[in-house]
């Protein structure tokens, strides 16, 4: 949503749904249109528009608290359709290009996810490491570059039930996570059973 400063009380809106066209309407009309989002207890998040949206979205695939790979896709949502129209090939999103966790261009994001953002999320939500899904992902947009010219990132959403397709490296990461958790559970069970065996 963008306020039209030359027209009091008017806004320009663009739905993220494929094929949508920009619309101009009074703010009150827009709020009425959004009422269904609140009817079931939902909410609307005021997320600032990112001018670097045409550079694409980065999907960071996680297994537990470790990065399992990345996907980079040139998206078209929230970008006005080209002159060829919303159904033209030019208006369609690009393919998601998959990368392993060691991809050089995403190492800053990997460090943030593993060392800062995931631990902060776990602390805020009261989630321990074994409770994290063995495969989940977080989608990011590029934010403005910092003073040193490095990329910054803005979170779009977190997915825990619709993560596929996944990078080629991700199945091995999932297997490692499952193995570690099973071994920990086995060790815990063995330690708990040891006093019972000694009594016998």
Language model features: what each stretch is:
Residues 126-137, 141-200:
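C-terminal active-site "lid" helix and adjoining low-complexity regulatory extension at the edge
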